[in-house]
């Protein structure tokens, strides 16, 4: 489960940003195309924050839906996989414009 190491990295990023202050809440953005399972991150969060500035912090996850832009006709549409064709023209030259995110969106500290 790579979500454990991802969650450990998120906690490290939060601690650096908190500059020694206690972390009360963390909001993450996780894209549907990122390959990260939000439920697994939630499961790992408590274990990864034990003994850190984020121990006891609340975790909220904002899921970012996948969106693609057709390279042929410029239509922007929802995508669930990297191989979705354009619904307008059927082309497969789609550029992902949203849904790959994995970032700390907000951090609440004391």
Swiss-Prot record:
GO terms for biological process: protein maturation; protein modification process. Ni(2+) binds at residue 2. The keyword Zinc applies. Pfam families: HypA. Keywords: Metal-binding, Nickel, Zinc. One of its GO terms (molecular function) is nickel cation binding. Zn(2+) binds at residues 70, 73, 86, 89. Involved in the maturation of [NiFe] hydrogenases. Required for nickel insertion into the metal center of the hydrogenase. Belongs to the HypA/HybF family. This is Hydrogenase maturation factor HypA. It comes from Geobacter sulfurreducens (strain ATCC 51573 / DSM 12127 / PCA).
């Amino acid at each position: 489960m790579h979500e454990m190491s991802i969650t450990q990295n998120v906690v490290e990023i939060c601690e650096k940003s908190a500059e020694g202050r206690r972390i009360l809440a963390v909001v993450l953005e996780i894209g549907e195309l990122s390959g990260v399972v939000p439920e697994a991150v939630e499961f790992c969060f408590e274990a990864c924050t034990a003994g850190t500035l984020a121990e006891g912090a609340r975790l909220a996850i904002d899921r970012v839906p996948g969106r693609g832009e057709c390279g042929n006709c410029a239509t922007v549409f929802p995508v669930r996989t990297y191989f979705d064709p354009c619904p307008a023209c059927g082309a497969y030259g789609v550029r992902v414009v949203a849904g790959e995110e994995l970032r700390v969106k907000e951090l609440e500290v004391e």
